[in-house]
């Protein structure tokens, strides 16, 4: 069986490595002319680390990032609402890791280049179309750098791993649109002294009044004890519908929301102001679709189930997709049947995560407290909600997203 993977991002590379591990030949076709270390931070939850450890990459990723020790939720006045241990500190068999997205991507890329060989991991291949029969699929590409057509590529099956704006998906869903909800985000990374434990994943404030997520991704980045700290602000802005993923953000558009957020554990406006770079883009997803598989073509990761980046789950779900699909293909059944079996196993699961990220994401804890207490500091949170109830809210998201402790073995 010859498998073509359209897209060399996290999902596509995880699939290539997993297929190679199962003895199934594949080729990766990535659009960019050259792969570089780009992006900001990403969190690898224990179920993602389970899959990456099975690929032999777990220890390397822990070394390159920072293993999260705890998660803490604060209101916008800096008061602690709830905290809990994370990853191995919570009894999971695998770590939870904050890491630079570019480091994660290059780790996967270099592993694929080493294991599959450079002739099977190709750049500068922009997808433009496909044809298929009941026996084969033919893919058409052009050079991203030069614009010239490339020779057609034939394969037994094709897997679309080309992201939230998937061109492959658009062939089957030509009227498919991103779902904008009027939430804008600004993201950056800042060199700073460690915050709290130095391994804490922090969420503060609600989207209605201004939310920020903060976690470290590189330790001792300068030899002087500073960390590279990733931060993401999320603010409700009705009517915001610009699909621009690489737009540079402007500090003056949002810093006023956080001007008073100077806590004894962190000066938030100072952290934001000292960022090396700020990116701005809207929070979007797409409604779950009934079908991913069309003959000898299927969708994976964000091409199949784009979701809000609110639960550190987008990459994790793509990586799990890769393992499930590789396992089905390795069973040796008819290839289109294997694609359908993969879809049956994953579509319902991921649809529930998409909806959970909309309705009850991890920071729902903060919103719930704001609903009970109001937009004001509290004297005794226990008068409004118990710690056990807060824990149940946190555990419910873990259950839906597939990383409850009992499910990660």
For the regions a protein language model found, what residue spans apply to each?
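Conserved N-terminal helical subregion
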Residues: 1-3, 20, 47-189, 238-241, ...
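Conserved mid-domain beta->alpha element of the FAD-binding
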Residues: 8-23, 27-32, 159-160, 186, ...
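Flavin-binding catalytic cores
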Residues: 244-277, 335-336, 343-344
């Amino acid at each position: 069986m010859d498998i073509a993977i359209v897209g060399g991002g996290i999902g596509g590379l995880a699939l290539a490595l997993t297929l190679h591990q199962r003895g199934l030949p594949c080729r990766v076709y990535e659009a960019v002319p050259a792969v570089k270390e780009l992006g900001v931070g990403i969190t690898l939850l224990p179920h993602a680390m389970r899959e990456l450890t099975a690929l032999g990459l777990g220890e390397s990723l822990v070394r390159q990032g920072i293993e999260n020790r705890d998660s803490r939720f604060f209101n916008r006045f800096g008061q602690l609402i709830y905290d809990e241990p994370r990853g191995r500190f919570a009894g999971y068999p695998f770590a939870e890791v904050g890491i630079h997205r570019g480091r994660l991507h290059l780790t996967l890329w270099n592993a694929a280049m080493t294991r599959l060989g450079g002739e099977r991991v190709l750049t500068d291949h922009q997808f433009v179309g496909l044809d298929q029969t009941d026996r084969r699929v033919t893919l058409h590409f052009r050079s991203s750098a030069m614009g010239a057509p490339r020779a057609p590529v034939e394969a037994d099956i094709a897997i679309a791993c080309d992201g939230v704006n998937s061109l492959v998906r658009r062939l089957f869903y030509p009227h498919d649109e991103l779902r904008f909800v009027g939430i804008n985000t600004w993201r950056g990374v800042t060199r700073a002294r460690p915050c709290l434990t130095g391994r804490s994943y922090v969420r503060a404030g609600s989207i209605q009044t201004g939310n920020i997520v903060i976690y470290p991704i590189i330790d001792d980045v300068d030899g002087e004890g500073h960390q590279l700290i990733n931060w993401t602000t999320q603010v409700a802005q009705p009517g915001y519908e610009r699909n621009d993923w690489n737009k540079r953000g402007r500090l003056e558009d949002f810093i006023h929301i956080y001007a008073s957020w100077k806590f004894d554990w962190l000066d938030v406006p100072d952290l934001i102001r000292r960022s090396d770079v700020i990116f701005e883009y809207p929070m979007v997803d797409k409604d779950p679709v009934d079908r991913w598989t069309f003959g000898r073509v299927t969708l994976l990761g964000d091409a199949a189930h784009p979701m809000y980046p609110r639960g550190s789950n987008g990459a994790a779900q793509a990586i799990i997709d890769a393992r499930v699909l590789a396992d089905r293909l390795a069973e040796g059944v008819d290839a289109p049947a294997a694609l359908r079996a993969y879809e049956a196993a994953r579509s319902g699961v991921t649809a529930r995560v998409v909806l959970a990220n909309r309705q009850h994401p991890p920071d729902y804890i903060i919103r719930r407290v704001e609903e009970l207490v109001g937009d004001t500091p509290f004297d005794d949170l226990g008068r409004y909600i118990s710690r056990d109830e807060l824990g149940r809210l946190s555990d419910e998201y873990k259950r839906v997203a597939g990383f409850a402790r009992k499910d990660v073995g």
